[in-house]
């Protein structure tokens, strides 16, 4: 029942999201709670940041479509939020925003004992990633990089 309910809610909420140039990034139903909690994470279709106003504008129409669908026969709490900042850096914008921040770089070098590098994000080009490790710039070809993520401190 939960999977079918979730799918039906996603279909309805996607239609509402389109009206605001949004998309439903994820929808979770916490049915073990009383009242149940519907957590919806939204994104803008143009990839700009979500504001509190975007969440607020989406809330009432989303609530109305859920109520009018009669899919839920119980009370619920609706939570609308943005995706927030991911620890993993993927977009060009991420690399510009977090230049100088401490990062962990997971490597896929099969013949190397080094699987993780830690340093300050220095530069990203189309071919390589450069990080500052204790004052020395290390350039890592992107074909050797598995994942780049923010970390809380430099080890």
Swiss-Prot record:
- Cellular location(s): Cytoplasm
Q: Which UniProt keywords apply?
A: Cytoplasm, Ribosome biogenesis
Q: Which GO terms describe its biological process?
A: ribosomal small subunit assembly; translation
Q: Name one GO cellular component term.
A: cytosol
Q: What does this protein do?
A: Required for maturation of 30S ribosomal subunits.
> Of which family is this protein a member?
Belongs to the RimP family.
> What HAMAP family does UniProt report for this protein, alphabetically?
RimP (MF_01077)
What is the protein name given in its UniProt record? Ribosome maturation factor RimP
Task: Name its species.
Answer: Prochlorococcus marinus (strain MIT 9515)
